[in-house]
């Protein structure tokens, strides 16, 4: 039906009112906010205001629905309504706002019909807080603005019993997983030096990232011994996790996908529930997350993803850039909107970033621009050595601070932590306050893990791993042999370890420890009963008191014990803070929130002291600073020598450079050293090729007096010294070990070498270690995982590519 004249007039004034609400946005941001129906890819460049777009898009969906482009007036609209809207447009009085918003709404979404998924708790919290200010706390609290893991946990808590788990399941972290894997290796009589637990955990995690079950993994081993054994470890790991009623972080997403795929009623419920699905940082998603998102959006197909393919830098964590590059193929009739106006950096910095990233082939393509013109040129400084480089960085900071800058204006970025040591030393000598931007030391401390273990066991007594951690902490005269015997009894009876401990006197084999075990069991049951009527803080105090943990620390009365006691009490502060922020605080919810605490969230808790921040380029993603130093701009360091010869890896390194450059708001310094001491050797390096990709007119450099010279030609400056790559330096460092009286071994392989093995196929050497006149090679093979081989034996079946 053709719109009437009244429809056209009403739609025009409605659009004008809505435009006023979003008047502070630029044209492309507003287009993204207004596009509500169907698949949408928002390519958001660095500093382009993507969070603002996400927030306002949710506001538009909840307040106005399809009102922006709806060609008709509401069915019950009158001329008086039209006049009211027109008057409101001319004079928007606050008392008239509610009615005006109602008149502009067409099929608005209810808040609980919107889900916005992020990667960090910090980002999710920011979304919720800004929504609260815009639509009120009641409506904002109904929106599912969560991390992937938190959203999945909400689904699992309601549905995981369909997979044979109890809804009070436990979440295992990396340390817990390692303990389980080590126990399995012991049961299978496998050598940890060959089946290194961290490597095995990584292989299992990568399998879960692509939704491979143990059976799927086993079917693809091709008879290879190593992978076949890992398949058996994976099978046993999953069995033990289920018996312990526990999930690891990868399971949280994988099990959610499994439920949505296998149970039609659950899938239909969530597809009908979520009219609008939004995902932040889409370039960082893996395959499992892509499948999850596709399932949730399968009802209405109103999926909006926000991301930047040029900032995809987490391949090592399982992220695949394919998800964002092929969005239009995966979701039919998708629309793509590019946010290219940058509000962070100067034009010079953006032009440099554009020039570098333009060299990548696998990208969607966009050009960042800004209205902040005539910025400072990029400073490229080549020092004689790493000491002079560190001294230069310190001097620049000191000079700017004397001129009125704050230490907190500065950040020093580097590709690898190995570069921070020298800079730290010079900062200390110069009295420059600094902090290494890092993760969650507090939650890794033994005493904190002990207290969390108590809380988890109260929540889930079937958690054998945490139970074994605390059953004799503090000492209760329950020895390792008794615990092992109890485990055997539990396995024979097909019950949990806790059930055996509760009734230990029923087992003759446990007679010596039975009384102590049953006392422990009664204590845990008491805590469970108290959890029904005590608040979390009071329950924590009860556990500290009745477990004897606090007394054990106080009795030692040494500095270490006092420090540990302080940490234990600091955890109580976390509990109190959690209680203050949540209307209905529960033990299960608190444990979930703490388990999902991320590195970024932990570092956010640091005070905002006036100090220079130092961090890896990966850690810098999402941050911004007035002045940024990128140290170690040398081929072999950055890009890493490991990316040489591999286009996919080199493009990821270039994206990392793009991220580093775009952290700077006002000034960018790129520093390098003509020679650098590494691995006990002096390395003569080439200037990073990424520096060579920046147009010369954007750079103020001390490298050459010829301003038009391309930086890729600066190799000539090094001809007076032999140019040695970092990979070659590894080899040199290894082969220059002190010689024994027997003939010294010389290794033909170095880290970074691409090789072919007659049995194991293609691979890359990741480390070389001298060992008994030979060298132990660690090689990451594409098909069989990482293997350790002795060089003399391997050489007969292996060659460089």
Model regions: which residues?
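P-loop NTPase Walker
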Residues: 1-167, 171, 268, 322, ...
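Conserved RecA-like helicase ATPase core segment
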Residues: 2-24, 59-70, 76, 83-104, ...
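ATP-hydrolysis module of ASCE/P-loop NTPase motor domains
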Residues: 36, 119, 139-143, 160-251, ...
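Helicase P-loop NTPase motor core
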Residues: 48-54, 69, 74, 89-107, ...
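Conserved helicase C-terminal RecA-like lobe
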Residues: 219-223, 406, 420-432, 445, ...
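Hydrophobic residues in beta-strands of the RecA-like P-loop NTPase core, especially within AAA+ ATPase
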Residues: 278-285, 306-307, 630
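C-terminal accessory regions
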Residues: 615, 632-786, 793-801
């Amino acid at each position: 039906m053709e719109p009437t004249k009244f429809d056209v007039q009403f739609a025009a004034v409605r659009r004008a009112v809505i435009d006023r609400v979003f008047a502070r946005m630029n044209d492309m941001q507003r287009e993204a906010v207004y596009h509500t129906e169907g698949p949408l890819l928002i390519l958001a460049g660095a500093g382009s205001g993507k969070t603002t777009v996400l927030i306002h898009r949710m506001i538009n969906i909840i307040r106005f629905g399809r009102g922006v482009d709806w060609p008709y007036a509401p069915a019950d609209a009158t001329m008086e309504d039209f006049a009211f809207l027109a008057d409101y447009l001319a004079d928007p009085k606050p008392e008239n706002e509610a009615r005006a918003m109602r008149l502009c709404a067409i099929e608005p979404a209810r808040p609980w019909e919107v889900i916005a998924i992020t990667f960090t708790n910090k980002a999710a919290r920011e979304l919720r807080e800004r929504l609260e200010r815009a639509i009120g706390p009641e409506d904002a609290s109904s929106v599912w603005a969560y991390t992937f893991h938190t959203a999945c946990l909400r689904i699992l808590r309601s549905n995981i019993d369909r997979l044979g788990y109890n809804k009070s399941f436990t979440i295992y972290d990396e340390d817990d997983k390692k303990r389980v894997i080590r126990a399995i290796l012991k049961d299978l009589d496998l050598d940890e030096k060959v089946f290194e637990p961290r490597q095995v955990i990584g292989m299992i995690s990568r399998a879960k990232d692509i939704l491979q079950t143990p059976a799927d993994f086993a079917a693809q081993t091709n008879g290879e011994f190593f992978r076949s054994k890992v398949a058996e470890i994976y099978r046993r790991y999953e069995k033990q996790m289920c018996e312990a009623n526990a999930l690891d972080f990868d399971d949280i997403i994988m099990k959610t996908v499994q439920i949505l795929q296998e149970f039609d009623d659950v899938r239909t419920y969530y597809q009908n529930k979520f009219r609008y699905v939004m995902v932040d940082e889409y370039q960082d998603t893996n395959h499992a997350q892509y499948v999850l998102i596709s399932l949730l959006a399968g009802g209405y197909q109103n999926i909006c993803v926000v991301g930047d393919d040029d900032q995809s830098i987490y391949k090592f964590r399982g992220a695949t850039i394919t998800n964002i590059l092929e969005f239009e193929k995966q979701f039919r009739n998708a629309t793509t909107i590019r946010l290219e106006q940058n509000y962070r950096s100067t034009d010079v910095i953006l032009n440099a970033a554009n020039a570098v990233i333009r060299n990548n082939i696998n990208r969607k393509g966009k050009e960042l621009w800004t209205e902040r013109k005539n910025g400072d040129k990029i400073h490229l400084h080549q020092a004689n050595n790493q000491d002079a480089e560190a001294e230069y960085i310190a001097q620049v900071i000191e000079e700017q601070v004397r001129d009125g800058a704050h230490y907190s204006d500065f950040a020093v970025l580097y590709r690898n932590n190995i570069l921070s040591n020298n800079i730290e030393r010079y900062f200390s000598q110069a009295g420059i306050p600094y902090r290494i931007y890092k993760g969650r030391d507090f939650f890794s401390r033994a005493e904190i893990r002990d207290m969390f273990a108590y809380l988890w066991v109260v929540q889930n007594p079937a958690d054998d791993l945490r139970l074994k951690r605390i059953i004799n902490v503090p000492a209760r005269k329950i020895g390792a042999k008794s615990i092992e015997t109890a485990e055997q009894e539990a396995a024979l009876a097909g019950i949990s370890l806790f059930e055996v401990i509760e009734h230990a006197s029923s087992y003759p084999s446990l007679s010596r420890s039975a009384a102590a075990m049953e006392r422990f069991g009664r204590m845990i049951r008491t805590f469970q009963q108290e959890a029904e009527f005590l608040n979390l803080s009071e329950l924590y105090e009860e556990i500290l008191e009745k477990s004897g943990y606090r007394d054990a620390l106080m009795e030692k009365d040494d500095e270490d014990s006092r420090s540990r006691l302080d940490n234990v009490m600091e955890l109580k502060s976390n509990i109190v803070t959690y209680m203050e922020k949540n209307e209905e605080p529960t033990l299960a919810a608190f444990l979930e929130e703490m388990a999902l605490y991320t590195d970024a969230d932990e570092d956010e808790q640091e005070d905002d002291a006036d100090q220079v921040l130092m961090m890896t380029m990966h850690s810098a993603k999402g941050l911004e600073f007035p002045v940024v130093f990128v140290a170690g701009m040398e081929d072999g360091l950055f890009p890493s020598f490991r990316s040489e010869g591999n286009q996919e890896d080199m493009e990821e390194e270039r994206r990392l450079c793009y991220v580093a450059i775009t952290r700077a708001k006002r000034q960018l310094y790129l520093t390098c050293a003509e020679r650098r001491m590494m691995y006990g050797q002096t390395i003569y390096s080439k200037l990073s090729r990424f520096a060579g990709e920046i147009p010369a007119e954007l750079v103020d450099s001390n490298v050459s007096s010829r301003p038009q010279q391309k930086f890729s030609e600066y190799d000539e400056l090094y001809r007076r010294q032999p140019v040695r790559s970092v990979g070659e330096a590894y080899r040199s460092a290894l082969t220059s070990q002190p010689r024994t009286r027997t003939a010294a071994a010389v290794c033909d392989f170095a880290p970074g070498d691409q090789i072919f093995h007659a049995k194991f196929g293609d691979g890359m050497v990741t480390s070389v270690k001298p060992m008994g006149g030979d060298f132990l090679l660690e090689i990451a093979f594409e098909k069989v995982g990482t293997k350790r081989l002795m060089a003399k034996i391997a050489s007969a079946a292996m060659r460089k590519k």
